[in-house]
From Swiss-Prot:
InterPro entries in the cross-refs: Flagellar_assembly_factor_FliW, Flagellar_assmbl_FliW_dom_sf
Extent of the signal sequence: none
UniProt protein name: Flagellar assembly factor FliW
Database matches in Gene3D superfamilies: BH3618-like (2.30.290.10)
GO biological process: bacterial-type flagellum assembly; regulation of translation
Main location, first listed in the record: cytoplasm
Gene coding for it: fliW
Protein species of origin: Exiguobacterium sp. (strain ATCC BAA-1283 / AT1b)
Record's subcellular location: Cytoplasm
Function according to Swiss-Prot or TrEMBL: Acts as an anti-CsrA protein, binds CsrA and prevents it from repressing translation of its target genes, one of which is flagellin. Binds to flagellin and participates in the assembly of the flagellum.
Binding partners and assembly: Interacts with translational regulator CsrA and flagellin(s).
Amino acid sequence: MFIETDYFGKIEINEAETITFVSEIPGFPDSKTFVLIPYGEDLPFWSLQSIEEQACAFVVTNPFWHKSDYAFELSDGAKDQLGIEEAEHVSVYSIVTLREPFESSTLNLKAPIVIETKERRGKQVILDDAYPARYPLGGTKAEVR
């Protein structure tokens, strides 16, 4: 299957690798199906690209690489929506807000993207935990407000 993207142009994707979101990412009601496209083999970033909307894409990364003590408990409702039965079938990503200079970029730890990897269902979860929506990408600077 071919899709058009703003960042990568026209690319071929494996339809079996698409992720269906069980609820919309806030502000993007027309995008329900996404695919993760790596920015490069040596880079820890992906584009979470909408299949339905060419211009809808989010830079994401694994939050545990940037904050090793990041932890949260999913609600039973979220687990049910995603069909999560085992933790080994879950991937978590954080949306990155890119800034100039790059070192000023931040992660949204408050609202991670949770993906059940067997059935490929996704959801952006808003956490009650005290995590910031703008955590410094390097994790060493003071929190950006």
